[in-house]
């Protein structure tokens, strides 16, 4: 049996999946999207290194790269999905990768999330920012806590400058109300859900308001409560994923979803959790392929 790992670059996650596949007597196939050639003729073919990839049992998507090429690669994988089960589904990856879509889906499905305003007009954004005592600007597309800007207690002139700078870099201004932790600490929760079960969770704490592990956040064990499990499963299903890393904030009125990650790493979780996440993913992938 051959199982794919689609990633433009090798990283800790691809190596973990590859190793776990080998331990399950599965032949891992590392697929670089840039190396796939598609034949669109009477017989549709997708090949890498002159070998078809249509015989894969299923394939994990890890990283399809950046730039203009990314749009082609996304479309290519979406069509490959007609022949090979792709995990996560490409529609779900698209929903999770766009913060506007994620926020919209949280609201449609009545899942608690911070108040959010999205605008392209800087002056309108400035008026909207005044609705919040404290606000965070986030790139629509991005991860690992990169590109975040917190606007708190600034003068109107300083806010306008921050918004103009953000707009010139990112094009669209996505603003989210800053949620204070009731315990007066900088921390959030990353919960890892596979199928219909939240299998692991951690607090990410920091002396800075950006708590991502890639921004020096420190992982600590987090109990999987009924409240946490319920909101994480709802977020995963709303976005349309098989598995996910869901980021949660604690607030004075309960938990709130801030992000749903469709291609999450569990390197940080592996430091504090005894759960074999890679094995859980392989098992779920085989079940998904069986029902595909």
From Swiss-Prot:
Keywords: ATP-binding, GTP-binding, Ligase, Magnesium, Manganese, Metal-binding, Nucleotide-binding. The gene is mptN. GO terms for molecular function: ATP binding; GTP binding; ligase activity, forming carbon-nitrogen bonds; metal ion binding. It catalyses: 5,6,7,8-tetrahydromethanopterin + L-glutamate + ATP = 5,6,7,8-tetrahydrosarcinapterin + ADP + phosphate + H(+). Pathway: Cofactor biosynthesis; 5,6,7,8-tetrahydrosarcinapterin biosynthesis. ATP binds at residues 138, 176-188, 204. Mn(2+) 2 binds at residues 259, 261. Mg(2+) 2 binds at residues 259, 261. Residues 103-286 form the ATP-grasp domain. Belongs to the RimK family. MptN subfamily. Its cofactor is Mg(2+); Mn(2+). This is Tetrahydromethanopterin:alpha-L-glutamate ligase. The keyword Lipoprotein does not apply. InterPro entries: ATP-grasp, ATP-grasp_RimK-type, ATP_grasp_subdomain_1, Rp_bS6_RimK/Lys_biosynth_LsyX, THMPT_Glu_ligase. It is an enzyme of class 6 (ligase). Its EC number is 6.3.2.33. SUPFAM superfamilies: Glutathione synthetase ATP-binding domain-like (SSF56059). Pfam families: RimK (PF08443). It comes from the Archaea. Mg(2+) 1 binds at residues 247, 259. Homodimer. Binds 2 magnesium or manganese ions per subunit. One of its GO terms (biological process) is protein modification process. One of its GO terms (cellular component) is cytoplasm. Mn(2+) 1 binds at residues 247, 259. Catalyzes the ATP or GTP-dependent addition of one L-glutamate molecule to tetrahydromethanopterin, producing tetrahydrosarcinapterin.
